[in-house]
UniProtKB/Swiss-Prot annotation:
A cellular-component GO term for this protein: ATP-binding cassette (ABC) transporter complex
Binding residues annotated for ATP, in chain numbering: 42-49
Name under which the protein is recorded: Spermidine/putrescine import ATP-binding protein PotA
Name of the gene this protein is made from: potA
Membrane topology reported for the UniProt record: Peripheral membrane protein
Keyword Chaperone: no
Family designation: Belongs to the ABC transporter superfamily. Spermidine/putrescine importer (TC 3.A.1.11.1) family.
A Pfam match: TOBE_2
EC number: 7.6.2.11
Organism encoding this protein: Bacteroides thetaiotaomicron (strain ATCC 29148 / DSM 2079 / JCM 5827 / CCUG 10774 / NCTC 10582 / VPI-5482 / E50)
Gene3D superfamilies tied to this protein: 2.40.50.100, P-loop containing nucleotide triphosphate hydrolases
GO molecular function: ABC-type putrescine transporter activity; ATP binding; ATP hydrolysis activity
Catalytic activity: ATP + H2O + polyamine-[polyamine-binding protein]Side 1 = ADP + phosphate + polyamineSide 2 + [polyamine-binding protein]Side 1
Amino acid sequence: MNMQEDKSIIEVSHVSKFFGDKTALDDVTLNVKKGEFVTILGPSGCGKTTLLRLIAGFQTASEGEIRISGKEITQTPPHKRPVNTVFQKYALFPHLNVYDNIAFGLKLKKTPKQTIGKKVKAALKMVGMTDYEYRDVDSLSGGQQQRVAIARAIVNEPEVLLLDEPLAALDLKMRKDMQMELKEMHKSLGITFVYVTHDQEEALTLSDTIVVMSEGKIQQIGTPIDIYNEPINSFVADFIGESNILNGTMIHDKLVRFCGTEFECVDEGFGENTPVDVVIRPEDLYIFPVSEMAQLTGVVQTSIFKGVHYEMTVLCGGYEFLVQDYHHFEVGAEVGLLVKPFDIHIMKKERVCNTFEGKLQDATHVEFLGCTFECASVEGLESGTDVKVEVDFDKVILQDNEEDGTLTGEVKFILYKGDHYHLTVWSDWDENVFVDTNDVWDDGDRVGITIPPDAIRVIKITD
């Protein structure tokens, strides 16, 4: 039985971690309740493993505080923390058999031999390895070795079990089987699991609570259902499952416009004529032969059988929708689409344009992003004045040849918005530049960045 309590067993308060001039974690605060199965989810490089290693004690926070069971342990070494860690690479001792691998920690604690025997057998039973205690670990499959690693961790009866992508090296079927076993194990043990993964489906399957991370920050914390159905921003919507994410305008409460059409929705409190992001899951779109019911009409561009459903792309007046349905429509078929009000999810836009801090050089030049840009003539401000600089997303120009740009950067995040791509480009000045483009770029592409003079708005900073 999972004995969940309101009391937090892990408290991470305003924790940051720096490696030189790079920020791995940026002011992270997280509370984990006793008995919870919490998954820290995010792409490679988001900071999830760094956070786990800080909780485990393998690294030390640059700023902030970590408590376990109310005790401050930020500087406490790993062996003195009430946690055990299971890694992707099982880290078993090849010269020891299964029994001795599991018993190793107990022997270090000078636990009585009879007690060790009972605990090892109980741990082996928990992971379904009762008949394997005297086998060499090299003779075991990957899944069996991972079970031994988990048994070695739980035999010490930690208050918290930390799992760093423990199933990543397993094949798909074995991974699915182990997911179910981990979930049952968590229920039986009743201890707190903190699990790190980049696999969205794994997180949705296993977790009581999901913590979504990106660029060293927590983006959203919630139940799997909340995270999936009510993503807080476009990153979460795109990263968790598949989504149609579109630019829209909230006309007023419960009425939104996107794709040139007005739709009823259930969202309120966004104000009138407010730019928003609209999220519709592919399975929430109804597709059928064109009829009066259709809110949008379009043509099927692709259709792929996925085993349980068909996945189709439908082009509606220049906007591309991803649709999942049990019914098959041939490529080229004219179809209607319909979405119900409660299946339209509205998100406040994180930003409506690029905003930078700058300094006016003279009437036609402004410095920002570490470079001097030509701009339209600025009246009424003296040279050297600190200013705010705004640039619309679609006015930023990216070049294949880095040397052609005023500055350079790397494409870090790509979001398809139905009729264009919204890119996050990490500039070499260590600031994000956001770009709307019809050109196809890949994550990791090095690019030149150019901003035309007439695209730069220089605004006086007011107190």
